[in-house]
Amino acid sequence: MKGISKILSASIALMKLENVYSATALCSNAYGLTPGQQGMAQQPSYVLIPSTPGTIANCASGSQDTYSPSPAAPTSPVTPGKTSENETSPSAPAEDVGTCKIAVLKHCDAPGTTSGTTPGSGPCETPEQQQPLSVISTTPAVPVTVESAQSPSVVPVVPVVAHHQAVPGYYNNGTSGIPGQQQILSGTLPPGATLCQGQAMPSTPGQQQILSGTLPPGVTLCQGQATPSTPGQQQVLSGTLPPGVTLCQGQATPSTPGQQQVLSGTLLPGATLCQDQGMPGTSGVPGQQGQSSGQCCAPQIPNPVMPPSMNISGNGYPSSTAYSPNLGSLGSCVDIQKTGGTSCEQKPEKSATQYAMEACATPTPTVIIGNSEYLVGPGMYNAINSPCNTAVQCC
């Protein structure tokens, strides 16, 4: 027991040096006493020492009923400098209170007396006898990091065209589209991404790239620098664009810096045709508008390649109708040409809507792209992107 007392006394001294105790008097006759015990002989007070300094915030606050001191043992006179057998609690030296493992130690060996108090009613030490505690160093308690279980953030998935809902530019057998066509993305898109965004380089058939490089002002992420490009990719060519030329989508034939391609193949709804700054003296290529042969060139855009039967579309028409692969001449679209001249004046006697109606046949089936249904008929996409709706350069 003497050995245990020495260990506990050394623990108290060590914790005093580590500033575990506060500056208030730890020995009080009111601690641990119920109202019925106030007039009785004083019981020794107890100091609750947490097992670790980090838990003192959990163990040091609470009602008196939370911590029950062990029953007092009869004390005997203690000679200063000597160690007594009853310095420790007669009960078990440790109690488990809630989640705090605390050691219960007796702070006072015997009640103290003062000139104005009687034994059993005053504090263990008079205010003159209480030695102030000097703070040697402040050792803050190690903060306890509580890691709360956070549910993983739900990433929204944007549905894209399924394999059985093939649309122009996408093929069920996994092969790449015709050069100049825009691919329909397979897989899932990132949140907020549109159909013009897809996988990073390198791309695979059925995907559309987000091209690397520096983007010119006003160009979105679905356009970028990629030279040379491959079928199914989207490129913005380097160099300076002529006034009024917009950024086109897709890739037709290999181009040089400063040129912009006009797509061959089929465009998606909303895609625009672009003008190509051709090389002087060269003839225009179908699908391009060049400055070469002295005549205005209208691109020949093939019909959408319809996929296999997809049952009946929403408008009641069968969606397995086959179409001619090419529209041929666009009819009234060519009436703005002037032959034998060096300039090309556009005649606005017909509106773009009239040109579109004349160039397009009666709408027949539809094709589903995402959650939208589009009419698909001969020249339907041409009505959206027809050269009749834009200024036609003189070649």
From Swiss-Prot:
GO terms for biological process: sporulation resulting in formation of a cellular spore. Keywords: Glycoprotein, Repeat, Signal, Sporulation. Residues 59-95, 111-133, 277-300 are annotated as: Disordered. Its main location: other. The gene is PTP1. It is found in: Spore polar tube. Interacts with PTP2 and PTP3. The lineage of its organism: Eukaryota, Fungi, Fungi incertae sedis, Microsporidia, Unikaryonidae. Involved with PTP2 and PTP3 in the formation of the polar tube through which the infectious agent is passed on to the host cell. Accounts for at least 70 percent of the mass of the polar tube. It comes from the Eukaryota. This is Polar tube protein 1.
